[in-house]
A protein has these predicted regions:
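Helix-to-loop junctions at the C-terminal end of transmembrane segments
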Residues: 58-71, 156, 264-279, 370
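Juxtamembrane intracellular "pre-TM" segments in multi-pass secondary transporters
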Residues: 1-10, 186-223, 408-430
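Conserved MFS/SLC helix-loop-helix module at the cytosolic interface between two early adjacent transmembrane helices
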Residues: 58-94
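Structural signature of the two symmetry-related core transmembrane helices
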Residues: 74-89, 280-296
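Helix-breaking motifs and short loop linkers at transmembrane-helix boundaries and internal kinks
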Residues: 39, 71, 92-97, 299-300
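Helix-loop boundary and gating motifs at the non-cytosolic
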Residues: 3-53, 215-255
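C-terminal membrane-cytosol helix-exit motif in multi-pass small-molecule transporters
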Residues: 153, 173-193, 391-396
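Cytoplasmic helix-loop-helix junction between adjacent transmembrane helices
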Residues: 102-141
Length: 430
């Protein structure tokens, strides 16, 4: 990695931490703010969460094309300004219409940030350094969310609207500060308008859908996000309250255990993951999460003490965190390596769209099941976890050797005396 790319990468990581820190201030308290503090009711609060998802689903198909044509930086800056306006609007909104409008702006801006930042990371990294770069991104995101949520919890007061206005103002300020930091980034290999592939949007999507490995990875990604991330604050938390009988403070401890596991284990796990086949790492995560669901089943359906049940439930979240730490240096870099030259933005946006779909469907399916159908809920998501293992092994058969084992590219370059050879580059983009 050149010095210029290294400097750009450091600023991108600072930006990731700032955005996560700002989101951590408000995300845990959004429902309480809309429903109780503003007095708009549970229905409006639920609609706010739905608007977040709908806004993301609307803008993401266009975001990828914009990143390819304009480059990730202009798209990121536009997303940050939009998110800042939405965050500030939420802090000042007093009516349902104003809250929903601001939520749409915040949701759209927040959704577009993900593929734009991911594409900037791709532009500033090489095949062999990409896993570490995405692991650092995930680490800083979780650290920022955790610290932001902790500080926000001490600043917020449910009896004072002004305390929430302060939180949303801080979030908006973080987005604007991130925009300032990102505006100084100079990405040496950032795509230019003239360099982008000259094809229609329909042609770009047709090309993506013609990539069998990318299609299989998208299906696998949907199951990953549906069976894990889509359950954290819906089905699994409902199961914990209704079946396990845990308190809200214990649920908070479980979420903290998840974040702590990621922060503590990320770089230790990275050393192991970097030398393994990506498909097998994802398959191992499926087995690990299957164990997590078994532990969750014991917590709610077993006949142990309440203390044992609570400990098992907290352990479930920690096991999920370990799996997340294994996935962060694996899945996102694989998306980038599957993308043809100049198409990373399109592929990142498509995968972000899959993620949003899974996060929208996951709570809708898991929430009611976790609250009332306890045994079927555990069995269903245990099977989904085993399905992850099957899909990952099947994906491995579609990947080239370099896509599945990126360190091979570096080894081949060394074998050739340090000069990159054509077949390696071609294989990495197959």
């Amino acid at each position: 990695m050149t010095r210029a790319k290294g400097a750009a990468m450091r600023r991108i990581h600072v930006g990731n931490a700032l955005s996560a820190f700002g989101l951590g201030f408000t995300v845990p308290y959004l429902y309480v703010y809309v429903a109780q503090v503003r007095g708009l009711g549970a229905m409006t609060a639920g609609l706010v969460l739905a608007v977040f998802a709908v806004a993301a689903l609307i803008v993401l198909p266009f975001a990828g094309r914009a990143i390819v044509r304009r480059g990730p930086l202009p798209v990121l800056l536009a997303a940050l300004v939009t998110a800042a306006v939405g965050a500030l609007g939420l802090g000042l909104a007093g009516t349902a219409t104003a809250v929903l409008t601001a939520s749409a702006a915040l949701g759209a801006g927040q959704a577009v940030m993900q593929p734009a930042l991911a594409t900037m990371i791709v532009d500033c990294s090489t095949t062999e350094t990409r896993s570490r770069a995405f692991a650092m991104q995930f680490f800083l995101q979780n650290l920022g969310l955790g610290v932001g949520g902790l500080i926000g919890g001490h600043l917020v007061d449910a009896t004072r609207v002004s305390s929430f206005t302060l939180l949303f103002s801080i979030e908006a300020a973080m987005f604007l500060l991130l925009a300032v930091v990102m505006a100084t980034v100079r990405v040496p290999s950032a795509p230019r308008v003239g360099d982008a592939p000259r094809q229609s949007a329909r042609g770009a999507w047709r090309q993506l859908l013609g990539n069998r490995a990318m299609v299989q990875l998208s299906v696998l990604g949907f199951v990953l996000f549906f069976a894990c991330y889509g359950q954290f604050e819906s089905g699994l938390s409902a199961y914990g309250v209704e079946a396990v009988g845990i308190s809200t403070s214990a649920l908070g401890t479980a979420l903290a255990a998840n974040t702590a596991m990621i922060v503590v284990a990320q770089f230790a796990v990275l050393r192991f993951v970097e030398r393994q086949k990506r498909s097998r790492v994802i398959a191992a995560v499926g087995l690990l999460w299957a164990v997590a669901w078994v532990v969750a089943g014991y917590a709610g359906l077993g006949h142990g003490s309440q203390e044992m049940a609570t400990a098992a439930f907290v352990s479930t979240y920690a096991l999920f965190g370990l799996g997340e730490a294994m996935l962060s240096p694996t899945v996102a870099p694989l998306v980038a390596d599957l993308a043809p030259s100049g198409m990373a933005g399109q592929y990142n946006s498509a995968f972000a769209l899959v993620k949003q779909l899974a996060l929208a469907v996951g709570p809708a399916v898991g929430g009611p099941m976790g609250a009332s159908l306890h045994a079927p809920y555990i069995v269903t998501f245990l099977l989904f976890s085993l399905g992850i293992t099957y899909l990952a092994l099947r994906l491995g058969r579609q990947l080239t050797a370099v896509q599945d084992q990126p360190w091979l590219a570096r080894n081949r370059v060394v074998a050739k005396g340090g000069a990159a050879v054509g077949p390696v580059a071609a294989e990495a983009q197959a």
